[in-house]
Amino acid sequence: MSGQAASYYNPSQSYGDFQPGMQNPQQQPDYYNNNVSNHGYDLNFQRGPEPKPPTEPPPTYNQAVYGFDDAFKIERPKYHDIWAGLLFIAVFLGYVAVSGVAIHRYAKYKGLNGDGIYDSSNSFSLDTNTLILFIFVLCVALAFSYAYFLGARYFSKLFIWVTGILNIVFALATGIYYIARKQYGGGIVFLLFGVFAIICFISWIPRIPFSAFMLQTSIDVSRKYGHMFIVSTIGGLVAVAFAAWFSVTLVSIYVAYEPSSSGSNPSCSDGGCSRARVIGLVVYVTFAMYWFSEWLKNTIHTTIAGVYGSWYFWSQSPNGMPRGSTRGAFRRATTYSFGSVSFGSLIIAIINMLRQACSVAQRNEAAEGSIVGSIMFWILGCFIAILDWLVTLFNRYAFCHIALYGKAYIPAAKDTWTMMRDRGIDALVNDCLIGPVLTMGSVFVSYVCALLAYLYLQFTKPSYNADGNFTAVIMAFAFVIGLQICQIFMTPVSSGIETIFVAMGWDPQVMIRDHPDLYYRMIQVYPRVQQAIQPSA
């Protein structure tokens, strides 16, 4: 593999070329064709000639020290998708401005909203009671997310089983609880979710050994190289801090601009309050929150991908890993690739906004007892979730390419997906459960946060929610906070696996030459590795 930016992989390399002295596993037939009986490939299919990446080592390879930028050089222009980076900065600055004004108005009339759970005289909007709820939600999300991260680190196979079972049990128990509380719409939705989780988990069982092996491989590498656990902890704490800031901003917007029918909101004495303004500002800060959270998540992912790429291509070289791989990968993600990371994050943020709107609508229908409406919005939410999964999958493998070679977002996505499809890596990706497992675990944490919000509102009975109008909104935001924090904590776990898959596709011969033990254990656990990845005829 080159130490220089590469837009193409070498289709002539395969996993069937062994070095002398290695035990040669039983040869598999050549599956790399487009015939239906041969995994959808045609025996007569031939790729046109593609330029091979240069094979020379980085300029300082034989010297005492070389860094990440020497190992993975990027071509000019070095900066890509600049418009997305500038737009991201503008949106974030707008968020800072809105937050500052809203929090100032909240602090100015804080007496109306109380200092604790029960002493508020605010009967028209969110208040300090809600702020304390979000503090509890943050603590629960932080504790569950970090415990989940430690579970992945120390109990790889058990981690997958426990995740699936907990989601099933929690979904069914929540559905039964809602029905017992006569919230039939929400109860039926959760029961359907539980049945769906059971079907998914049963289909997972044959693929658990391979997934557990890949997870353990990622964890083993992280213990020896890079700073995965430090990056995860710092990223998680930044996510918690931003979620706290967002929670204060959200409550402040309602306090500052929510009109009161009795005219009791002192913030509205000088005008400027309206329901439309509240909705507009909430939509804006929610979108900014999603975009920042996705950018943070993808920056962590790109950083970790750089570390695993360094391990895959250079750990067995005479001079070992490039010096400062973690710092070098982070520096590239926040400079040359800042625009590309912002672009990919923007797409996910838009989809998440649609899913959030659907979630709020579904909970409103459930609160009003509309079973049909609740189920319809749940089904729509499932389609949006599938779209989110597909785009996220597409994004994360593209970011692995961006981490190493610094290409623009769209060319990197096209090149990476073409390579993975032609190599057969997409088959391995589909059979690896780590992505769905981590998503399911994050959803579990978010449902715990949403349930906490519901119980808190039921037991504290704030005056602003006497008719239950704010229940769906508060639960939805508690769900989002739990989901984003857990996903950010767990990002480094999946990043290693995804980078290994991409690196295997770009240069499979490195796996044979530099990591033979890993390769042989992989084909023992999952023989389809030899069948899925073959050179073209």
Curated annotation (Swiss-Prot):
UniProt keyword annotation of Glycoprotein present: yes
Q: Does the keyword Cytoplasm apply?
A: no
Q: List the top taxonomic levels of the source.
A: Eukaryota, Fungi, Dikarya, Ascomycota, Pezizomycotina
Instruction: State the similarity comment.
Output: Belongs to the CTL (choline transporter-like) family.
Q: What is this protein called?
A: Protein pns1
What keywords would UniProt list here?
A: Cell membrane, Glycoprotein, Membrane, Transmembrane, Transmembrane helix, Transport
Tell me which residues are glycosylated: N469
The UniProt entry's GO biological process terms, in alphabetical order, are: transmembrane transport
The molecular function terms in GO held by this entry are:
transmembrane transporter activity
Location in the cell reads:
Cell membrane
The membrane topology term of the UniProt record is: Multi-pass membrane protein
The membrane-spanning stretches of this chain are: 82-102, 131-151, 159-179, 185-205, 228-248, 276-296, 334-354, 371-391, 433-453, 470-490
Describe the task this protein carries out.
Probably involved in transport through the plasma membrane.
* Compositional bias segments (type: Polar residues): 1-16
Q: Which gene encodes it?
A: pns1
Q: Name one Pfam family in it.
A: Choline_transpo
Tell me which domain of life the UniProt entry assigns to the organism this sequence originates from: Eukaryota
Q: Which PANTHER family match?
A: CHOLINE TRANSPORTER-LIKE (SLC FAMILY 44), PROTEIN PNS1
